[in-house]
A protein has these predicted regions:
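Extracellular glycan-targeting catalytic surfaces
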Residues: 1-105
C-alpha cells in the first residue's frame, strides 16, 4: 500500500528538470549532433508554419457540452509547436525562435 511507503519519502522531494535551462550551454552542448539536428529541424519546421488557431469558442464549446476533442486537438497542436520551438531555441541559443515562442504562448 502507498500509506506503508510514505514514511520512506523525504520531507522535500529533490528538484527535477527534464532538461538543463537554456543558459546552461555545457548541458546543451553535450547533446549528440543527431539530436541537435533533429531538434533544430523540428523547430524550424514549426516556425515556418502558421500559428494554429485556438479560438475561445472551442473551449466554450467544451465547457458547455463536454465535447473536448476539437479543443484538445487545437491546444495540443499549440503545445507541440511550443515544445519544438523552445527546444530548438535551447539548442541554438541565438534568439531566432523567440518571436515564434512568444506568439505561441
Amino acid at each position: 500500500m502507498i500509506s506503508e511507503r510514505l514514511p520512506f519519502l523525504p520531507e522535500v522531494l529533490p528538484s527535477f528538470r527534464p532538461c538543463p535551462p537554456a543558459h546552461d550551454r555545457a548541458g546543451w552542448e553535450t547533446l549528440p549532433p543527431a539530436a541537435k539536428k533533429r531538434l533544430m529541424a523540428a523547430g524550424a519546421a514549426e516556425a515556418a508554419k502558421p500559428l494554429p488557431a485556438l479560438p475561445l469558442s472551442l473551449w466554450l464549446d467544451f465547457a458547455r457540452t463536454g465535447k473536448r476533442s476539437e479543443w484538445e486537438e487545437a491546444c495540443f497542436a499549440r503545445r507541440a509547436r511550443l515544445c519544438a520551438l523552445a527546444a530548438a531555441e535551447c539548442v541554438e541559443y541565438q534568439g531566432r525562435f523567440l518571436d515564434a515562442i512568444a506568439d505561441t504562448v
